[in-house]
Structures are given as C-alpha cells and as structure tokens.
C-alpha cells in the first residue's frame, strides 16, 4: 500500500471512522518541539564524540531553524493543492512552485548564524549572503534533484535548512488527511516526494511500527518492517550493528538492490532522533560501504559529493 493525502471531506465520504488497530499512515511533524529536541540530542551526542565539533555545528543550525520558524511563520493558502495534485504528492519537489519565503528563511538563518561563525563557515555564510536569487534558485533546484557537487557541499546544509523549514511549514498547513491506497513508490515521502533520512521503530501508540522520516518536510510515513524501504523486496534483508544485536541503531541492508537504510529503535533508547542519531553513527555508514552497500537515504548535514539516481 502507498500513502495519499486527500481532502478531509473525501476521507469522510469514503471511509468509516477509525477502527481499533488502525495504523496511522502518515505523521506530520510537531514543529514546536522538533527542532529543540533535535538540537538537544545533537549536543548530547557531541559529548566525547569523534565528530563532536560537527555535531555541535549541526545543533547550532537546528537552533537557528527553531528561532527562524518562530520569527517567520508561513501564511499560505493550500486549500486547492490536494485537489490539483492528483496522483502526485501535494507538495511534490519536482513541480511545486517555490516562492520567495524560503529566501527570507535563508537570510534569517544566515543572520542568526553569523555572529558565532568563523573560518570556513563564516566565509560560506558570507558567500550565500552575496548570492543572487537566481543563483540560490539554481542551487536549490540542484539539491532537490539530487545533483550534488563537491564544490557546493559547504553551502548545501544551509540551503537545505531553509528549504526544509519552508516545506515543513507547508506540510503543517495541508488541509487534509492521509490514507493508505494501492500503489508503488513508497520509498518517497507522500507529502513532498523527497527521500528519508532514516527509519524510526516507534514506541507509544505506534509501538513496533516503522516510520520513514522525510529529510525535507519532516513528515513520517508508515513502512512495514522486514521489507526493503528502497525496492520493497524482503528475501535478502540483513541487519547490521556496531555494538550488539540489542543496539538502538541498525542498518537494514538489501541484497536485491544493494542499498541500506538505518533504523533507530526507540524501545532500545527512547532518545534516538531521526537526523541526530543518523549523523552521529557515521561509523556504521563506513562499515556498510565496506560491505558493498550504498546508502538509500540522505542526511541534511551530510550530502554526497556526486549526483545519485
């Protein structure tokens, strides 16, 4: 089953009220707590970590996102988007028109980050500050189309942080509900069409369920376990960890398509966070590459140096 967002009235016409045992197909982010929780987790993980400086840098960017979210709320009428999107995700990155709000968000992020920046980070922020709107749009399009270049990787986390804020705000404004329908392409976010950063096996009311966390709009969509999140095959799956079988972070590899995605288990550690713990477990990525697998997800603070399919 794939996931589609439909207008509330259509859902009410076609479905009975939620039954016991119903699995929520889609979870929208709670932006009031998302960034503060992520920043806190990044700072926790940075302590005595080989990548501590970079995790601390990432925490600073996330804290800036929290401040900019508060100072620059998005006011946008998306009432017709669901009706116009058809089979596509309503905020499809391939076709949804970006407006100037994301430029405002980027400028605000730069303003928040510059006072504490130095060296290469400060130079990158200043270069972004000088960039024309056309240059920014071209770089944004390249990132969203997965056209990565090593020479632009220093700018990518900041541009993506602004784009992510923009899409996450829009996702929160969608006037509809999600339902599971027959279909394919479940490896892509049903809200915006981007790809996951990691998968989270949850606690609470969704205990034991796996949700893929979008690396752009921050939504999470249900994906059954013991099935490759990239090609949906289940015959050649293996699970890898650095510590033990009880590790809170594992890589799920697929011998059929040759890719892997990290899974974070809240039952093993309730503090795990989709972006933070994925970034802090880079050693596991190195191990998976040594085993011949390629990553099927992208962390917003760790972009490839070349384009991917």
UniProtKB/Swiss-Prot annotation:
NCBIfam families: FdhE, PRK03564.1. It is found in: Cytoplasm. Signal peptide: none annotated. This is Protein FdhE homolog. HAMAP family: FdeH. Belongs to the FdhE family. GO terms for biological process: protein maturation. InterPro entries: FdhE-like_sf (IPR024064), FdhE_C (IPR056796), FdhE_central (IPR056797), FdhE_N (IPR056774), Formate_DH_accessory (IPR006452). Keywords: Cytoplasm. Necessary for formate dehydrogenase activity. One of its GO terms (molecular function) is ferric iron binding. The keyword Cytoplasm applies. It comes from Pectobacterium atrosepticum (strain SCRI 1043 / ATCC BAA-672).
């Amino acid at each position: 089953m794939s996931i589609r967002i439909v207008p509330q009235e259509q859902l009410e016409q076609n479905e009975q009220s939620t039954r016991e045992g119903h699995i929520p197909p889609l979870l929208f982010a709670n932006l009031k707590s998302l960034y503060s929780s992520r920043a806190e987790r990044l700072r926790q993980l940075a302590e005595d970590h080989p990548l501590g400086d970079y995790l601390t840098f990432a925490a600073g960017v996330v804290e800036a996102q929290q401040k900019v979210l508060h100072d620059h709320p998005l006011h946008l009428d998306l009432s017709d988007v669901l009706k116009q999107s058809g089979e596509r995700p309503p905020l499809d990155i391939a076709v949804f028109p970006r407006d100037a709000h994301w430029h405002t968000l980027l400028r605000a992020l730069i303003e928040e980050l510059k006072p504490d920046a130095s060296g290469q980070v400060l130079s990158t922020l200043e270069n972004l500050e000088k960039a024309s709107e056309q240059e920014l749009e071209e770089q944004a399009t390249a990132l969203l189309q997965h056209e990565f270049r090593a020479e632009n990787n220093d700018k990518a986390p900041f541009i993506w942080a602004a784009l992510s804020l923009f899409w996450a705000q829009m996702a929160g404004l969608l006037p509809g509900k999600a339902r599971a329908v027959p279909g394919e392409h479940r490896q892509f976010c049903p809200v915006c069409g981007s790809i996951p950063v990691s998968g989270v096996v949850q606690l609470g009311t969704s205990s034991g369920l796996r949700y893929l966390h979008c690396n752009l709009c921050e939504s999470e969509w249900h994906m059954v376990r013991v099935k490759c999140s990239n090609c949906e095959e289940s015959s050649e799956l293996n699970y890898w960890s650095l510590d033990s079988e009880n590790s809170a972070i594992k890589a799920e590899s697929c011998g059929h398509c040759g890719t892997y995605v990290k899974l974070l288990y809240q039952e093993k550690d309730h503090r795990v966070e989709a972006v933070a713990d994925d970034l802090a477990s880079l050693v596991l990525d190195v191990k998976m590459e040594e085993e011949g697998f390629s990553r099927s997800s992208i962390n917003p603070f760790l972009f490839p140096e070349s384009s991917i399919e």
